């Protein structure tokens, strides 16, 4: 377990500074598939953002995903800002059990994002990301390829 935490920390230490080079940067949490854990989000410009999530896999292992989204629509409901994005992501999971050794998922995705501010000081985004994809499951019997589906609900704080 200590090795898994060290690997996870190294992934975060390498990925975050590279992603945070441009634009606004956010950190938060994400619950979903293929990854549940700490998420980092970075805006590259007004239309394009990237994200990375690292955490623990449901099957007993570690996981990480990276992706990018392009903003295609923006609208308001009352004073609240919402926007719709399309993009893609890829995730990898390494298991520490007998049945599944590892899994890789690649997916097209869309998301609905809600930006809000608390007391005109703190900027947050809540998002729901869903999409179809393909999964590669590595077991003792070989590689199984099949349809997959990604989904996540998250909250990030921009700093």
Please provide the spans of the model-predicted regions:
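C-terminal binding/interaction regions
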Residues: 129-131
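Solvent-exposed loop/turn segments connecting transmembrane beta-strands
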Residues: 25-39, 54-64, 96-103, 138-148
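Outer-membrane beta-barrel "beta-signal"
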Residues: 66-68, 146-159
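Cleavable N-terminal export/targeting peptides
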Residues: 1-24
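Gram-negative (and chloroplast) outer-membrane scaffold detector with strong preference
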Residues: 42-126
């Amino acid at each position: 377990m200590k090795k898994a935490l060290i690997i996870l920390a190294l992934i975060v230490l390498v990925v975050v500074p590279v992603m945070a080079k441009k634009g606004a940067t956010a950190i938060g949490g994400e619950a979903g598939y293929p990854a549940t854990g700490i998420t980092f989000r970075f805006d590259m410009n007004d239309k394009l953002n990237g994200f990375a999530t690292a955490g623990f896999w449901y099957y007993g292992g570690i996981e990480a995903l990276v992706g990018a989204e392009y903003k295609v629509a923006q609208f308001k409901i009352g004073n609240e800002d919402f926007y719709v994005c399309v993009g893609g992501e890829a995730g990898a999971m390494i298991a520490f059990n007998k049945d599944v050794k590892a899994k890789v998922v690649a997916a097209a995705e869309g998301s609905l994002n809600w930006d809000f501010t608390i007391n005109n000081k703190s900027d947050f985004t809540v998002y729901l990301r869903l999409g179809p994809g393909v999964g590669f499951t590595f077991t003792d019997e070989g590689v199984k390829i099949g349809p997959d589906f990604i989904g996540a609900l998250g909250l990030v704080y921009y700093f």
